[in-house]
UniProtKB/Swiss-Prot annotation:
Bilayer topology annotation: Multi-pass membrane protein
HAMAP family linked: C4_dicarb_transport
Protein family per UniProt: Belongs to the dicarboxylate/amino acid:cation symporter (DAACS) (TC 2.A.23) family.
Localization annotation: Cell inner membrane
GO biological process: L-aspartate transmembrane transport
Taxonomic source organism: Citrifermentans bemidjiense (strain ATCC BAA-1014 / DSM 16622 / JCM 12645 / Bem)
GO molecular function: fumarate transmembrane transporter activity; malate:proton symporter activity; succinate transmembrane transporter activity
Function: Responsible for the transport of dicarboxylates such as succinate, fumarate, and malate from the periplasm across the membrane.
NCBIfam families linked: PRK01663.1, PRK13027.1
The protein's name: C4-dicarboxylate transport protein
Cellular component terms (Gene Ontology): plasma membrane
Length: 439
């Protein structure tokens, strides 16, 4: 088998592109800012392919199940895990921010804050309504509309119904099943083509960020940022690490396995940008297609651990900075509201801030104008949010697969311990035959 040289690996190319992007943004800020279309273009290409991949994966996963009760069982276990772990993430964020108290002493006067930049977020947040509205929003007005607008939960809902219907058809549904499975392979082939542009996208996104906000903005409100990054690391390596150990895998080896996806997320600040490739890698790791197809798409709305940590820390920080006292009842109210609002957040850049604005609107105790304090650094915290979200959903898929006895533990051990030939693993991932060894 051929062994790739270090510079041929996607993770090296993306890391190099990010470094160049930082340099361009710092030394040539105007040029860096002009690179924004490169990052936006890459994310748009990824989003273009997400809904058809989810549809095909979920349909083939469900239609391929022998027991239809399994669909409800997998979904139920996934939602139970999501609620438990994301609530734990909210609680950890709440605990750390109250211990470190980075906002104490800022004495910010909300009447003097520049709130012009909040208009877009508060307007979007104002559209958020009750749980009933959220539940009804999962049902698309039309199938075409759901695909056209890239509504993941709506596509997931339709895919589950279609998969159940296809399974009920029995042998008559087999030709359709095989066709959709072939289409899924073709779409993953498109993903492999798009991923070749990942370094360009990461370069453009990072050059724009540094060019527009400057390295100096990385140090603004640094205590909050440091606290947030520390909390995310604690959550990944302690909480998810413990969960991983209980399920038979090492979190460090798991992170090493998905390092390319993590670097793509680091460059684009969107955990959604790595979704298609993450699904393929989890199947390659030994998780069943049916579990991957149900858990990953659902997790991108119900299991955003990084966003959960951010929401509690940001809310309490604003309260501290504006000298808004919070008693135990008010703190628990914030936690309860966030348990609901955090479930509607999507894995795209900026969604966390919109969710935060919606939460503040529901909790009049904390001044909405206080969001202006963190608007400038929100972009620099989005990387940690997205990275934590990605790792959290990856771990969740392995956990649910194990609960369902749908995890090939031997395969997982071989892949994580790098006992398989690297070229063979890459070939499996790309759904291609391994290249022959050169003479």
């Amino acid at each position: 088998m051929k062994t790739k040289k270090f510079y041929q690996h996607l993770y090296f190319q993306v890391l190099t592109a990010i470094s160049i992007g930082v340099a361009v943004g710092y030394y040539m800020p105007d040029t860096g800012t002009a690179m924004k279309p490169l990052g936006d273009g890459f994310i748009k290409m990824i989003k273009m392919i997400i809904t058809p991949i989810i549809f095909c994966t979920v349909v083939t996963g469900i239609a391929g199940m022998d027991d239809m009760k399994k669909v409800g069982r997998v979904g139920g276990k996934a939602l139970l895990y999501f609620e438990a772990v994301s609530t734990l993430a909210l609680a950890i964020g709440l605990m750390v921010i109250n211990v470190i108290q980075p906002g104490v002493g800022m004495n910010a006067d909300v009447t003097k804050l520049d709130t012009k930049g909040l208009a877009t977020y508060t307007a979007t947040a104002a559209k958020s309504h009750s749980f009933a509205d959220f539940a009804l929003g999962i049902i698309p007005n039309s199938v075409v509309d759901a695909f056209a607008k890239g509504e993941i939960l709506q596509v997931l809902f339709f895919a589950i119904l279609f998969g159940l219907a296809l399974s009920a058809m029995g042998e008559k549904g087999k030709p359709v099943y095989r066709m959709i499975d072939d289409v899924a392979h073709a779409f993953f082939g498109v993903v492999n083509i798009i991923m070749k542009f990942a370094p360009i996208g990461a370069f453009g996104a990072m050059a724009f960020t540094i060019g527009k906000f400057g390295l100096g903005s990385l140090t603004k409100l640094g205590m909050l940022m440091g606290s947030f990054y520390l909390t995310c690391l604690l959550f990944i390596f302690v909480v998810l690490g413990t969960i991983g150990k209980l399920c038979g895998f090492n979190i460090f080896k798991f992170i090493s396995y998905i390092k390319e996806e993590l670097l793509i997320v680091l460059g684009t600040s969107s955990s959604e940008s790595a979704l298609p490739r993450l699904m393929a890698k989890l199947e390659n790791l030994g998780c069943s297609k049916s579990v991957v197809g149900l858990v990953i798409p659902t997790g991108y709305s119900f299991n955003l651990d990084g966003t959960s940590i951010y929401l509690t820390m940001a809310a309490v920080f604003v309260a501290q900075a504006t000298n808004t006292p919070l008693d135990l009842t008010q703190t628990l109210t914030i936690l309860g509201v966030l348990m609901l609002t955090s479930k509607g957040a999507a894995g795209v850049t900026g969604s966390g801030f919109v969710t935060l604005a919606a939460t503040f609107a529901a909790i009049p105790t904390i001044p909405v104008a206080g969001l202006a304090l963190i608007l400038g650094i929100d972009r620099f915290m989005s990387e940690a949010r997205a990275l934590t979200n990605l790792v959290g959903n990856g771990v969740a898929t392995v956990v649910v697969s194990r609960w369902e006895n749908e995890l090939n533990a031997t395969r997982m051990s071989q892949v994580l311990n790098k006992e398989l030939d690297e070229a063979a693993v890459e070939a499996d991932l790309l759904m291609m035959d391994p290249e022959p060894e050169e003479a």
